[in-house]
């Protein structure tokens, strides 16, 4: 600790400047996400899953198969559920796992679901899942207190009650492998059997060894945005969807207990200050001074509440490349990204769009590596 | 004033009367009214000492002696230390004039700087005693060495050693202090009074050391290089001349160069005589000066005459200390005085 | 909750947090801290030294100050020029020598001695000046070297003349007068010092050489680019330093009539301490005679106080050294952080509670529609910042731009435009006077008048200063909108007195009544503040009764009505409260209605923040301005209200792409024209069912 930091530490932090990591270095903004091919428009499109039978995606209460036709794609409904789908995962043998809000996990194939209702966990906040090679299913529970759609409330309450549990390959037995996480929102298996988990509210990626009781180990910290779902990249890397930006104002509100409590108590969550999946046209939405439209132009670097960001990490977990849709764009709220047959797809939940990314650099862990 | 005096006498008389009454039972001696007056008059008076600087033998010695008497007779004694700065000294003196103590003991950095201010101080009713270094203004009293006499004695000693045929040569060097100080101005006069009668003595160097032993050392160093056959040297102050002496010793000419210096006669100076660094040490005896100073302070504080009305001075006797007569009686340490 | 809110409101009403920031904006604040230090030192001295306050102390101080202060002035001038003069002490000694040799040794007349002394100082200063100004040597090293050189000269000459100097006293009444004399109890030397100091102050602060000196010291390159002879200016600074030092030396000589080997030694440090302590910035360009004097008095009191405390001399010097370090440290930190501190503390939010917004259904008059989504655009990309729009009797359209011009779009199609007038500041509110002159409120300037031929004249740029305001509120900072009463009086709003045009949005964060309504009477030429303490008063429009006016209080989301004439004169009442957005300009519409342009829409989160001033203050301090919470001004909305204050229509730009943040409207012949202060276009949209012949001019002044 430097002397300056030490001196500052002696005084209450009430006036200290708040900073968030800058979009810089590997996260230097570009427009690649905004300019990516928009294959399909599908409201509430969310989680992508690669199956032997093709690419699947969830949207609302339904499950679709994506059929690409060159520059466009169509979505064919293959299953419907009673409540919104919160995650989709697919095993190597073609088995699917679908999290349904308040209705457990459905494992199997469309039409032949086996329902598992994990005991002792919040079944309405199953945010992500992934199958291990032995058929074990790992599922993230964002929060013990709130359903998935109330993620904002969990953030504002400083939620750190998330868990990851494993579902046995045959008997469907459930076992918690990690808890006390701040909204685990994505899971992917690393080559060595460990799990990579995105911990949204702590802006970081941690790894968990499901076979040991060791504490989660952070491999990527201080992300400039809130991470969401993860998926393996060819060559051993990791795809990372980041669903909303971090802003100084959000961090301030998160520190301002009195203001935040009253905001939560008296104001509709849609109007709260905090991250969003998409920009809103409503006139009652909060705004930051830098987001004021000047001379007919909204600056791309304006501190917007939503943002589009996808990043790819190499096999060591170091980010190598990023795709952005900035304040003046609309491909915001990326919740899922996956690689299939050399193509990379991402879902902009904020705008309800399926995107195909133009992947570029090759550093040994790339999409085309 | 007269009324006051009368009242005072009356009071003394009353006290004496009661004394007689109470003493009638048993003889307990007589109270000396003069002693009481002496003490009463001095009590609560304010004496300020303005030295060149504190932190060296002379001023510390005088201060110690003066402080003792102040303690004994219960008057206040303060020191304003300008730390060798004439400017700070004048400022101190100026503020003393507005502060109006009863008496200032001034130690002049040179014979001019304080001269007018001392006159002003007396005009403002402050009695002024100058100590050891005079100024152009004669004040109520001066206590200290007669620098002319020191100069004459020093020159005479050098003449005795360096007259033609007596020493290696007739070359003599003089290290002065601050050219405008009384110790320089008047001592040089004394020196040249003697030297002028002995035209064979050559003065090869006369430089100011600003009381700085290091400067004195380097001056003597240079002189000895230019005049390896130097016979005698007159230094103006023992503290600075430790430098002169060390240059002589370093050149290995301790036995060749006859060094005369003067000072307050403290132990260090005496030791230097013993070591043979100084060949003749003319001491103006700080403890003695201190006592005379004390007597003058008491006299002036008791005196009814106003400041500057009568001007006296006393040049105290000097002691020539050589190896032969270095003894306890001639030398002092600060601890002795405290 | 209610009780704590009430407490909060009282606390923000009665504790004037804003004053601290306002004080910091004052330029004299640089002097305040040294002055406070001086007062503190004096108080401490009075406390610990009995009898410190006396006539003697002051005349004593005055005498010392005359010499010390002159040298401090000398050093101040050099430091102002961006340099430093360490040789003042040695120079001083040489000049003393010159004076004493002239007087005591050579027995010259006082005038000649003075000339000789000044000449000595001049030559010494000139040497420094040439070396530093023309040969571009480093000031520090150069004057360090000349310090040694001058001292060596002194040491060589002094012993040779010492006895002669002390041996004689000149007989000269003038000399004695300078040294000891006093005039009505004031020492003569002090009078000389005061005269010189006043002269130096005038030269430094009011005359060209002083400005040039500061410019050179502040930013040498800029000064050079501005055509200032940098070399000469620097050189002259050192010459001035030499001459002032010589003057001080002359006074010193007259006072003491003597000199010692140590004269001037250590003076540079004492004087440097004084100057820096007084607030002269070592970086150059900042400082004044006042600083030098304050610092000198401080150091003199400190040193004489310490001497009177019978401190050992070395301790005095140690203390002075520590004081110098502290002063230098403070100076560096202060110069660096004053702006930062000001930024941090200037914003001073207050409690502002707006009524709860009602939730509105689809059928509500305020429901979002897109009637402004497809406007006809005028001057897209040609105008920047058309805050207000107005049309003349010939249907030409006028608007101000942030480039400082008023642009005229020509009827009938408004495809062609021309610069009607160049103002120099951003014209905001516009209104036609009955004689056809266009009146405009210009941000940062005042109210101006443009004749039909395009000639610009100032109407007013100041009002009466309020007694208790710390910041000077007599100048107009942000006049916003105006209207003309039937008798020709101009009523205009000044949105805020605390912020400049470019920072108007910051005022939203404060939510305090920083604005006012002002009236200018062209008959008497006087301008008086009518109402103050208004919360961002914005649009002004005269009601049809000719006795009252409506004005918007933007951050309070309300429209007020104020009677300036007639039986209700002086009455102020709320016309329309709890608007869904922040009202900007108000304009008359056809059928006796009024148009209200909404600058932005309220958000519940911002409303909540307005009730939490401490939160907003922390926001202003902790996060970047771009991230500050703001009303939603990315949507556009215009309201139409009846004469009785009922909202009868609302026109929205739903996406906010063409007309976010509408700041003004103007109805003209069945069309509604829209302006926006941060927009680059003007829009017009047809108003269904409006009188196609109705014009604002006609409504005000009758049809032609």
Predicted regions and their residues:
Chain B
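Hydrophobic alpha-helical segments within soluble ligand-binding/sensing domains
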Residues: 34, 89, 143-170, 186, ...
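Flexible loop/hinge segments that line or gate small-molecule binding clefts
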Residues: 111-149, 168-171, 265-274, 278-279, ...
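Short, solvent-exposed amphipathic alpha-helices that sit
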Residues: 58-73, 150-157, 182-201, 215, ...
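Extracytoplasmic "Venus flytrap"
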Residues: 28-65, 69, 73, 77-91, ...
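Hinge/cleft segment of the Venus flytrap/periplasmic-binding protein
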Residues: 26-45, 175, 179, 183, ...
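Short beta-strand elements at the ligand-binding edges of bilobed clamshell
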Residues: 79-81, 135-160, 174-175, 206, ...
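Short beta-strand elements in bilobed, periplasmic/extracellular small-molecule ligand-binding domains
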Residues: 71-83, 171-174, 192-213
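Hydrophobic alpha-helical
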Residues: 103-123, 191, 205, 209-271
């Amino acid at each position: 600790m430097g002397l300056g930091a030490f001196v500052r530490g002696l005084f209450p932090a009430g006036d200290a400047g708040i900073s968030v990591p800058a979009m810089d270095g590997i996260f230097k903004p570009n427009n690649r996400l905004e300019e990516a091919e928009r294959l399909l428009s599908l409201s509430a499109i969310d989680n992508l899953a690669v199956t032997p039978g093709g690419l699947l995606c969830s949207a609302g209460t339904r499950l679709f198969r994506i059929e690409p036709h060159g520059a466009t794609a169509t979505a064919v409904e293959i299953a419907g559920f009673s409540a919104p789908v919160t995650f989709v995962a697919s095993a190597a043998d073609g088995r699917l796992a679908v999290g349904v809000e308040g209705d457990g996990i459905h494992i199997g194939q469309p039409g032949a679901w086996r329902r598992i209702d994990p005991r002792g966990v919040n079944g309405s906040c199953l945010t992500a899942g992934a199958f291990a090679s032995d058929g074990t299913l790992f599922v993230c529970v964002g929060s013990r207190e709130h359903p998935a759609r109330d993620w904002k409330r969990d953030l504002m309450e400083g939620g750190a009650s998330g868990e990851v549990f494993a579902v046995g390959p045959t008997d469907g037995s459930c076992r918690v492998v990690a808890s006390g996480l701040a909204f685990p929102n994505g899971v992917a298996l690393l080559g060595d059997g460990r799990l990579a988990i995105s911990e949204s509210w702590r802006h970081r990626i941690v790894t968990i060894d499901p076979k040991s009781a060791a504490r989660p180990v952070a491999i990527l910290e201080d992300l400039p945005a809130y991470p969401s779902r993860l998926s393996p990249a060819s060559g051993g890397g990791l795809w990372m969807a980041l669903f909303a930006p971090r802003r100084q104002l959000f961090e301030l509100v998160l520190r301002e207990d009195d203001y935040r409590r009253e905001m939560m108590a008296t104001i509709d969550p849609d109007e709260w200050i905090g991250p969003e999946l998409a920009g809103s046209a409503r006139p009652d939405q909060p705004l930051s001074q830098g987001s004021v439209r000047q001379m007919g132009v909204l600056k791309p670097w304006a501190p917007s509440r939503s943002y589009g960001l996808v990043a790819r990490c190499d096999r060591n977990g170091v980010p190598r490349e990023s795709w952005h849709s900035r304040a003046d764009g609309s491909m915001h709220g990326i919740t899922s990204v996956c690689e299939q047959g050399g193509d990379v797809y991402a879902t902009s939940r904020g705008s309800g769009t399926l995107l195909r990314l133009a992947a570029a650099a090759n550093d040994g862990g790339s999409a085309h590596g | 004033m007269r009324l006051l005096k009368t009242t005072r006498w009356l009071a003394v008389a009353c006290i004496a009367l009661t004394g007689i009454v109470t003493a009638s039972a048993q003889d307990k001696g007589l109270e000396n009214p003069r002693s009481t007056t002496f003490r009463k008059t001095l009590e609560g008076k304010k004496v300020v000492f303005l030295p060149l600087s504190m932190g060296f033998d002379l001023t510390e010695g005088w201060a110690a002696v003066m402080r003792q008497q102040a303690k004994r007779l219960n008057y206040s004694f303060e020191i304003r230390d300008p730390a060798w700065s004439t400017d700070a000294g004048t400022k101190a003196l100026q503020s003393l004039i507005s502060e109006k103590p009863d008496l200032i003991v001034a130690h002049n950095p040179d014979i001019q700087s304080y001269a007018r201010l001392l006159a002003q101080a007396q005009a403002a009713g402050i009695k002024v005693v100058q100590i050891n270094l005079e100024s152009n203004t004669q004040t109520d009293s001066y206590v200290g060495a007669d620098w002319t006499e020191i100069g004459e004695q020093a020159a005479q000693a050098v003449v005795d050693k360096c007259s033609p045929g007596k020493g290696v040569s007739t070359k003599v060097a003089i290290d002065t202090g601050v050219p405008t100080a009384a110790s320089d101005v008047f001592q040089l006069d004394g020196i040249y009074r003697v030297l002028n009668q002995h035209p064979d003595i050559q003065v090869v160097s006369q430089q100011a050391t600003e009381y700085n032993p290091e400067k004195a050392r380097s001056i003597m160093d240079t002189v000895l290089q230019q005049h390896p056959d130097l016979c005698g040297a007159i230094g103006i102050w023992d503290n600075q001349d430790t430098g002169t002496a060390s240059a002589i010793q370093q050149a290995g000419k301790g036995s060749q160069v006859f060094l005369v210096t003067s000072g307050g006669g403290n132990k260090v100076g005496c030791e230097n005589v013993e070591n043979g660094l100084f060949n003749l040490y003319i001491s103006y005896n700080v403890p003695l000066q201190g006592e005379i100073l004390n007597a003058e302070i008491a006299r002036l504080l008791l005196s009814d005459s106003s400041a500057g009305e009568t001007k006296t001075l006393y040049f105290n006797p000097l002691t020539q200390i050589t190896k032969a007569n270095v003894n306890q009686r001639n030398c002092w340490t600060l601890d002795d005085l405290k | 909750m209610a009780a704590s809110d009430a407490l909060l409101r009282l606390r923000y009403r009665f504790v004037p947090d804003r004053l601290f920031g306002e004080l910091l904006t004052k330029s004299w604040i640089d002097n305040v801290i040294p002055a406070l230090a001086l007062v503190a030192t004096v108080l401490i001295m009075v406390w610990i030294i009995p009898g410190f306050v006396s006539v003697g102390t002051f005349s004593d101080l005055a005498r010392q100050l005359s010499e010390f202060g002159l040298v401090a002035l000398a050093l101040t001038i050099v430091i102002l020029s961006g340099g430093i003069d360490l040789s003042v002490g040695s120079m001083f000694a040489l000049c003393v020598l010159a004076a004493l040799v002239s007087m005591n040794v050579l027995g010259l007349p006082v005038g000649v001695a003075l000339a000789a002394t000044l000449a000595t100082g001049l030559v010494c200063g000139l040497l420094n000046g040439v070396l530093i100004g023309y040969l571009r040597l480093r000031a520090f090293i150069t004057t360090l070297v000349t310090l040694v050189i001058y001292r060596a000269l002194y040491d060589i000459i002094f012993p040779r003349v010492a006895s002669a100097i002390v041996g004689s006293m000149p007989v000269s009444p003038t000399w004695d007068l300078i040294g000891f004399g006093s005039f009505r109890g004031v020492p003569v030397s002090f009078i000389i010092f005061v005269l010189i100091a006043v002269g130096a102050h005038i030269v430094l602060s009011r005359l060209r050489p002083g400005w040039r000196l500061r410019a050179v010291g502040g930013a040498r390159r800029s000064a050079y680019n501005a055509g200032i002879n940098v070399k000469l200016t620097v050189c002259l600074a050192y010459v001035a330093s030499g001459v002032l030092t010589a003057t001080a030396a002359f006074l010193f000589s007259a006072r003491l009539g003597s000199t010692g080997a140590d004269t001037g030694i250590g003076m540079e440090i004492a004087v440097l301490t004084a100057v820096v302590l007084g607030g002269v910035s070592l970086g150059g360009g900042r400082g004044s005679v006042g600083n030098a004097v304050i610092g000198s008095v401080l150091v003199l009191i400190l040193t004489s106080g310490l001497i009177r405390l019978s401190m050992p001399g070395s301790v005095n010097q140690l203390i002075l050294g520590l004081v110098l370090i502290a002063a230098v440290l403070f100076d560096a930190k202060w110069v660096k952080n004053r702006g930062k501190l000001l930024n941090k503390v200037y914003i001073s939010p207050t409690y502002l509670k707006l009524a709860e917004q009602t939730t509105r259904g689809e059928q509500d008059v305020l429901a979002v529609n897109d009637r402004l989504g497809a406007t006809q655009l005028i001057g897209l990309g040609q105008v920047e910042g058309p805050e207000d729009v107005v049309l003349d009797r010939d249907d030409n359209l006028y608007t101000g731009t942030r480039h400082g011009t008023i642009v005229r779009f020509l009827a009938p199609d408004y495809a062609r435009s021309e610069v009607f007038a160049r103002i120099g500041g951003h014209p905001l509110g516009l209104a036609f006077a009955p004689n056809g002159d266009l009146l405009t409120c210009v941000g940062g300037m005042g109210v101006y008048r443009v004749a039909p031929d395009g000639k610009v004249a100032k109407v007013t740029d100041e009002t009466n200063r309020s007694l208790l305001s710390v910041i000077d509120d007599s100048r107009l900072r942000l006049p916003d909108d105006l209207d003309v009463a039937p008798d020709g009086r101009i009523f205009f709003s000044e949105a805020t007195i605390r912020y400049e045009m470019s920072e108007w949005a910051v005022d939203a964060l404060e939510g305090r009544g920083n604005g006012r309504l002002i009236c200018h009477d062209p008959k008497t030429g006087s301008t008086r503040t009518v109402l103050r303490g208004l919360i961002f008063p914005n649009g002004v429009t005269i009601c049809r009764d000719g006795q009252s006016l409506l004005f918007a209080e933007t951050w309070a989301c309300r429209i007020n009505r104020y009677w300036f004439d007639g039986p209700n004169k002086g009455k102020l009442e709320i016309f329309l409260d709890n608007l869904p957005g922040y009202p900007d300009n108000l304009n008359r519409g056809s059928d006796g209605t009024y148009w209200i342009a909404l600058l932005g829409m309220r958000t519940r989160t911002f409303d909540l923040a307005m009730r939490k001033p401490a939160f907003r203050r922390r926001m202003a301090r902790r996060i970047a301005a771009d991230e500050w919470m703001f009303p939603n001004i990315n949507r556009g909305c215009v309201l139409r209200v009846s004469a009785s204050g009922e909202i009868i229509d609302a026109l929205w730009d739903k996406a906010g792409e063409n007309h976010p943040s509408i700041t003004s409207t103007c109805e003209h012949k069945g069309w509604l024209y829209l302006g926006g202060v941060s927009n680059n276009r003007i829009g017009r949209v047809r108003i269904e069912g409006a009188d196609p012949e109705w014009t604002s001019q006609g409504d005000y002044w009758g049809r032609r």
